[in-house]
Structures are given as structure tokens and as C-alpha cells.
Amino acid sequence: MLMITSFANPRVAQAFVDYMATQGVILTIQQHNQSDVWLADESQAERVRAELARFLGNPADPRYLAASWQSGHTDSGLHYRRYPFFAALRERAGPVTWVMMIACVVVFIAMQILGDQEVMLWLAWPFDPTLKFEFWRYFTHALMHFSLMHILFNLLWWWYLGGAVEKRLGSGKLIVITLISALLSGYVQQKFSGPWFGGLSGVVYALMGYVWLRGERDPQSGIYLQRGLIIFALIWIVAGWFDLFGMSMANGAHIAGLAVGLAMAFVDSLNARKRK
């Protein structure tokens, strides 16, 4: 037997299995930490992977629900645990995801108590040649947020995307994406606006680009982002570039972060294909 993929949500796994059954392909689900989908007839692997890519691109397509109705599995018979809010947060987020979220919250509280300027003197991108060897500054600008909406928006996306990467690909992969995107998006942004900027959005855009393209090119990675969300990200970049909402946005960081994420996903998916 060959394991095709794993789903965090058992209902999503059942929908894919039901659809493949209507196509004459029998898959089975084994429940461990996630719902693992297995194929008995390995000669059909390429066909199943191609269908999986289409499924991940639009899992809400009516044909998948229709397949579940046809197979009589709209109620999969699985019993789901009910999680309180914080338990649900823990379920998706790994240690690196949590450490970053806590660090951002601590820095945000410090900025409210001490003032933005005081904290930026310690964490901002090097604003003087004498500070260029304070290497933490090339990364800690990502920890600073200047409003409640700013930090909530970024941490929500960080938890959603970063948590998925960490759970599926490991803490090391999330750390690498975070460090590279923080460094390069910060470098580009300081060329646009100088050193006085902050926020996790460059890293968030890198994760958006990475999760979307890695899911498109390597469905077996187990991560994906709906195309509508990546389109939203592009619209947001355009809106920020033309100042359509009258908001101060780190446009350089957004563009650089997205480019970094796409580039890393392309390389990783290429390497994954070579290993097959």
C-alpha cells in the first residue's frame, strides 16, 4: 500500500476518498494524529496524485460533495473531538509558531508601556553605521507592531500559515523561511522607507507564497492555500502600493517576502520531485 497524503480534517479526507471511489479508485483512511489516505493499487498512484492536486486547489467544488452524497458518506461516521478555543490554537501551532507569537505580544506590550521609539532604538533595522554588527536587528524588526489591528492581522496569518508549515514540514523549515524572509524583506523595506519600520508582514507574505506554490507543485507536502487567498494577497499589495486605503504599509517588505516565499517553494518542490 502507498500513503498518498494526510489531512488534518477527517471530513476533508473522506470527501476526497468518496470522490475517488466514483472514479473507480479505492482509497482507505487510517486515523493516527491525522487522517492518512492510503492506496492499495500503486499502479494508480499518478492518477490519484493528479486528482489530489485538483482537489486541493478547490476542495469546496460541488462535485466532491456530490460524490459524498452518491456514496452515502456525507456523515462519515467519524467522531470528532471538540476543542475549546485555546486547545484548537495548540492543535495547529508548533513550538516555533508559539514562540514567535509570544515574542510579538511581549514586544507589543513593551511598546505600549515604554513607547514605540524606545523599543525601536533596540530592535529596529540598523539606523546608524555603528549598529551594523548588532546582528539581531536584521530580524527583530519583524517583532514590532504599531497597532492592535496590525498585530492581530499578522499573528492570525502567522498562526494559520506558519502552524501548517511547522506541523507538516517541521520546525526547521519554518525557522529557515522566517529568518530568510525577515532578513531580505527588511533589507528591501529599508531601501524604500529607511530603518523605521516593523511588523511580521514580510514573513507572512513569504509564508503565503510558499504555502500556495508548494501546495500547487507538490500536493504530497500536505500544505496548500486556496487560490482566492493568494489573489487577495496580491490585491492587498496593489492597494498598498497605490495607497488606496490611506494606510501606511510596508510595501517593499510585502513584495520581497512574497518573492522569497515563491522562490523557496519552487526550489523545495523541485527537490521533492527529484527525490521521487
Swiss-Prot record:
Purpose: Rhomboid-type serine protease that catalyzes intramembrane proteolysis.
Gene Ontology molecular function terms on file: serine-type endopeptidase activity
Annotated family: Belongs to the peptidase S54 family.
BP terms from Gene Ontology: proteolysis
Chief site of localization: membrane
Residues forming the catalytic site: 201 (nucleophile), 254
Catalytic reaction equation(s): Cleaves type-1 transmembrane domains using a catalytic dyad composed of serine and histidine that are contributed by different transmembrane domains
Cellular component GO terms held in the UniProt record: plasma membrane
Membrane topology of this protein: Multi-pass membrane protein
EC number: 3.4.21.105
Protein name as catalogued: Rhomboid protease GlpG
Subcellular location: Cell inner membrane
Entry keywords, A to Z: Cell inner membrane, Cell membrane, Hydrolase, Membrane, Protease, Serine protease, Transmembrane, Transmembrane helix
Pfam families: Rhomboid, Rhomboid_N
UniProt organism field: Escherichia coli O81 (strain ED1a)
